[in-house]
Amino acid sequence: MSYIPYVVEKTGRGERSYDIYSRLLKDRIIMLSGEINDAVASTVVAQLLFLEAEDPDKDIYLYINSPGGVVTSGMSIFDTMNYIKPDVCTICIGQAASMGAFLLSSGAKGKRYSLPNSRIMIHQPLGGARGQATDIQIQAKEIQRLKDTLNGILASQTGQDFATIEKDTDRDNFMSAEEACSYGLIDEVITKHK
């Protein structure tokens, strides 16, 4: 269990204590840290929906430091980012790998950023199957469908053609922030807060 700091905000009406993530949420900042699973995705989706309800015309900032995770969990975040009205600006801090990189590239065009020493990694979805031959065939067909879906979206987001994405995601493909910018996963490498 990691330590979560609290901050105290003083107002004319007294003091209020927030955990740091709740305080950042007041500034429309969502932190996506660690592995992406159903619990993390549910929290991020809820925060996106809450911030849209608060102000549908104001950008949301999604900071990403993630090794990736479950494809379906990540897709729930992706779909929500596209469903809500506000632009979602994505910023890589540390690393955005696998589904983390996919979500980084899914930010609003022109608003996808990385800090200079971050690393970004894309690859094909991982999976495993056990059971009877028919069950394994079903799972193989589904992972191929997910791979094609993800590659199609990445092609659209980066401006790369589908064949290039398919080749470049065949194995782990690590990029610096500058390389990710040239590739089209992000729009700009930033060193100072805008």
Swiss-Prot record:
It comes from the Bacteria. The keyword Protease applies. Pfam families: CLP_protease. The active site is at S98 (nucleophile), H123. GO terms for biological process: protein quality control for misfolded or incompletely synthesized proteins. Its EC number is 3.4.21.92. Keywords: Cytoplasm, Hydrolase, Protease, Serine protease. GO terms for molecular function: ATP-dependent peptidase activity; ATPase binding; serine-type endopeptidase activity. Belongs to the peptidase S14 family. Fourteen ClpP subunits assemble into 2 heptameric rings which stack back to back to give a disk-like structure with a central cavity, resembling the structure of eukaryotic proteasomes. Cleaves peptides in various proteins in a process that requires ATP hydrolysis. Has a chymotrypsin-like activity. Plays a major role in the degradation of misfolded proteins. This is ATP-dependent Clp protease proteolytic subunit. The gene is clpP.
